[in-house]
Amino acid sequence: MISDNVKKGVIRSPNRALLKACGYSDEDMEKPFIGVVNSFTEVVPGHIHLKTLSDVVKHGVYANGGTPFEFNTIGICDGIAMGHEGMKYSLPSREIIADAVESMARAHGFDGLVLIPTCDKIVPGMIMGALRLNIPFIVVTGGPMLPGEFQGKKYELISLFEGVGEYQVGKITEEELRCIEDCACPGAGSCAGLYTANSMACLTEALGLSLPMCATTHAIDAQKVRLAKKSGSKIVNMVKEDLKPTDILTKEAFENAILVDLALGGSTNTTLHIPAIANEIENKFITLDDFDRLSDEVPHIASIKPGGNHYMIDLHNAGGIPAVFNVLKEKIRNTKTVDGRSTLEIAESVKYINYNVIRKVEAPVHETAGLRVLKGNLAPNGCVVKIGAVNPKMHKHEGPAKVYNSEDEAISAILGGEIVKGDVVVIRYEGPSGGPGMREMLSPTSAICGMGLDDSVALITDGRFSGGSRGPCIGHVSPEAAAGGVIAAIENGDIIKIDMIGKEINVDLDESVIKERLSKLGEFEPKIKKGYLSRYSRLVSSADEGAVLK
């Protein structure tokens, strides 16, 4: 065992003394050391219940002959960080979390890990760190939040972001907005739709790293507690079997995750996180081109918020990810999972599917997959749109650019009435390096939706979007403006042509004009000169490469 390097032999007497100071016995030190990686925090609703889950995980570890050691990572709530400088830290926090998991596990000689994340960047961050070690690990995602209810109508967090736009144009009163605010988030869990946190939980299960039904089992459900205990027991077996993550995470496993993502219409942020996770195994193991290639294999089969009217609780009750496997079984690759059964064995074990929620492939929500990769002279390296959440009339759009050099400028313009039907809002210098941190543009997109412009106005950015964004929102434009991408050359009034079905995005300018404009810009001057974001800005790669540190 790896932990023998920490605890075995006369030379490790000082090490054992320190462990005994923590209350561990000689008997405990004979067992596999299991790190229980928690991300409990009192500021994130998706994480406020994780103490309970970690305690239950530890019971499972003990019961099956392991010795658990709990430690914590940070966890940022994207919703609370949204719309201000705090959002610049969200994506970069993924790398801090990965480094923390790697450092703690290696320093203390853990034989295996149980990861307990919930929200957006914490899930991929923990997995990335654990992959660097290539020791057995299993993931227990914290589970979704239930939607709230007010006057017989269901609400969740995105209702509030769009509600701000509705208030601005007089659709609702401030009192009505406050009533929705009081009920939209009724308790623990990740926001109730198929936003980034829940998308990543679903893909973690699809990768084979969580037990079946873990992704969709809700935070307040006793089944989540049972899954946590079973996961604690399971990791001890995995250590004894030496079932490493690289035994599970083959190219085909990543393809399964992408197929599930495309079929469900998950968050566009998955196109950052899945390549970043794969990068820990092999450089460019998975790229944006894989999303593009696989998008032709599956249709969009589930109408879940923000791309429909269903919630995560509906997906769970319809059969969860095993049911999605079953519906897609002609496309799903047969790969290993931490459960011990293969993906197709899990698919065949499904006893019930609600086909009103998880549609059959021959009767999908949309014929095209839920995510789309676009390329053209505006984004030579690609950009991403959640086409499953776009009004079909906006699948093709041509309009004049309204250009803003930050999210703050754009939201002021939108709420100030500067945007009219037909416009293409361009928000730049918000990429991984330029932002820095690649902020989510949820406030601008929600304002556009709330003001009723989402069927006539497109938004393009080198930043990214919340999983809760809907409408013609095209993000991750690569190369970004700070790297001299074409988006930096766009001026007010330039005509932008978008064809989501044809997978194209172009600005109607001659190449010579683009080159001339870019030549006059000079070298990008970083916005932040010190601290973590300054280092991040210098070291981060492009969005099409997963925005990983070089």
UniProtKB/Swiss-Prot annotation:
As its record notes, the protein acts as a catalyst of: (2R)-2,3-dihydroxy-3-methylbutanoate = 3-methyl-2-oxobutanoate + H2O; (2R,3R)-2,3-dihydroxy-3-methylpentanoate = (S)-3-methyl-2-oxopentanoate + H2O
Its quaternary organisation is: Homodimer.
Give the source species.
Answer: Methanococcus maripaludis (strain C6 / ATCC BAA-1332)
Q: Where does Mg(2+) bind?
A: 78, 120-121, 440
Per its UniProt record, what SUPFAM superfamilies does this chain match?
IlvD/EDD N-terminal domain-like, LeuD/IlvD-like
Cofactor(s) listed in the protein's UniProt record? [2Fe-2S] cluster; Mg(2+)
What is the name of the gene encoding this protein?
ilvD
Q: Which UniProt keywords apply?
A: 2Fe-2S, Amino-acid biosynthesis, Branched-chain amino acid biosynthesis, Iron, Iron-sulfur, Lyase, Magnesium, Metal-binding
Q: Which GO terms describe its cellular component?
A: cytosol
Enumerate the active-site residues.
Answer: 466 (proton acceptor)
**Which one GO biological process term can you cite for this protein?**
L-valine biosynthetic process
Family the entry assigns:
Belongs to the IlvD/Edd family.
Cofactor binding note of this UniProt entry: Binds 1 [2Fe-2S] cluster per subunit. This cluster acts as a Lewis acid cofactor.
Q: What does this protein do?
A: Functions in the biosynthesis of branched-chain amino acids. Catalyzes the dehydration of (2R,3R)-2,3-dihydroxy-3-methylpentanoate (2,3-dihydroxy-3-methylvalerate) into 2-oxo-3-methylpentanoate (2-oxo-3-methylvalerate) and of (2R)-2,3-dihydroxy-3-methylbutanoate (2,3-dihydroxyisovalerate) into 2-oxo-3-methylbutanoate (2-oxoisovalerate), the penultimate precursor to L-isoleucine and L-valine, respectively.
- Cited Gene3D superfamilies: IlvD/EDD C-terminal domain-like
Taxonomy, superkingdom: Archaea
Q: Which HAMAP family does this UniProt record tie to the protein? A: IlvD
> For the modification N6-carboxylysine, which residues carry it?
121
Q: Which pathway does it operate in? A: Amino-acid biosynthesis; L-isoleucine biosynthesis; L-isoleucine from 2-oxobutanoate: step 3/4; Amino-acid biosynthesis; L-valine biosynthesis; L-valine from pyruvate: step 3/4
Task: Cite a single GO MF annotation.
Answer: dihydroxy-acid dehydratase activity
Protein name according to UniProt: Dihydroxy-acid dehydratase
Annotated EC:
4.2.1.9
